[in-house]
Amino acid sequence: MEITNPILTGFNPDPSLCRQGEDYYIATSTFEWFPGVRIYHSRDLKNWSLVSTPLDRVSMLDMKGNPDSGGIWAPCLSYADGKFWLLYTDVKIVDSPWKNGRNFLVTAPSIEGPWSEPIPMGNGGFDPSLFHDDDGRKYYLYRPWGPRHHSNPHNTIVMQAFDPQTGTLSPERKTLFTGTPLCYTEGAHLYRHAGWYYLMVAEGGTSYEHAVVVLRSKTIDGPYELHPEVTMMTSWHLPENPLQKSGHGSLLQTHTGEWYMAYLTSRPLRLPGVPLLASGGRGYCPLGRETGIARIEWRDGWPYVEGGKHAQLTVKGPQVAEQPAAVQGSRRDDFDASSLDPKLQTLRVPFDDTLGSLTARPGYLRLYGNDSLNSTFTQSTVARRWQHFTFRAETRMQFSPVHFQQSAGLTCYYNSKNWSYCFVDYEEGQGRTIKVIQLDHNVPSWPLHEQPITVPESAESIWLRVDVDTLVYRYSYSFDGETWHAVPVTYEAWKLSDDYIGGRGFFTGAFVGLHCEDISGDGCHADFDYFTYEPV
């Protein structure tokens, strides 16, 4: 059996790999998207399906007002003592010497839940993980962050004992590692194998310099010695490798005794004419940070990536029977169910009757007008990840705005300061019109502002479509669902990427979805008959 990377396409970073018997799970970060954390299941490490979105209550995750790329950072999923343990950080500030990250622990008897109410685990850092030692003791690891550590890019990994009976941490913090010259040490996981404790961390920052670093010690407190090659995995030395940014590893031994590591990776698109080693030459990744898997071999008591330390497109699978490919469900959503399809998410807040309804008009998704796409509070946005470099997304909408502060339509979205929006609104003296707007690093542009497209009064429905073609994308519209007209604007798909956004809010990936806003607060709504996403 051969596994093709990435195993989780589109925005699925910071994988945490976990085994229960012959079942395997990966938890990934969701940042400002709700519900928080996505958990995938497999029995062969090749075919994966989404089975749980555990942080689905405000009591577990209150992100209203969180900044772009705040929210859920690097969850840690483990199984011990007959239940699943999930650690996560809700980051409230991203661009300062303070993160104000709030760490929590929830547990569940089954991966589907029910998940407990969260136990606070302190606010001193991020990327927490939990290690269950063979003697039953439990240890909590994380990267501390604050004014002093902010100025020191090496940072540290610290550990505290955790008492599961009282839900409390020991006040003593033990420093396990102070980093290598690669800097930006984070994403720590601890393992025990063949008489050694192994500490696996991410370093180099989560861009092209990203790497996995491993250390070991005979005692849990250390001292820890570095891997002979320092970096166990990185793609930094191979700029033409199709899988880049490889790092943030999570190790696992299968029930057949084989070893694998999940890691995050990205597939860059290179711009024509830009030299490989020039600024931007390595490319742009609109699909965000995805999840890959590597096969691990042990030599002289150290783990190594089979085939070399770089991320590889194909990997030999474990000695288990290949399972049927996961049924992903129709890529057409007719909104006939009583709840949103799990592939759809909202921004920061749950989908409730403030945002919309699936029952107000059966067979339609009704979105109520709320904040603009520029907001970080209450937005009526329902979207899904870009998972392919070429695809078409389409919807049919019924919407009757009465003034210019009301709009609804289709968006391609990276964060609150970088998106495009093809929408219907209202112009006095003209009636309903179709326009597009782009926000690029928070700078707006309205290419059709002087000549909007008039919607015929007889048009009961309006169809909107976006075609993404590798580096560019274009919107189009129809008034009958058969004859389509292109909006005369071409947008650059590569700009909806971590690499273009930069700064401190660049941890997600591009989404496409439906949106309705009413900044007047008068209370409009839009009804969406369907939403399709089809790779081309």
Where are these regions (language model features)?
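Carbohydrate-active catalytic/glycan-binding domains of CAZyme proteins
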Residues: 1-536
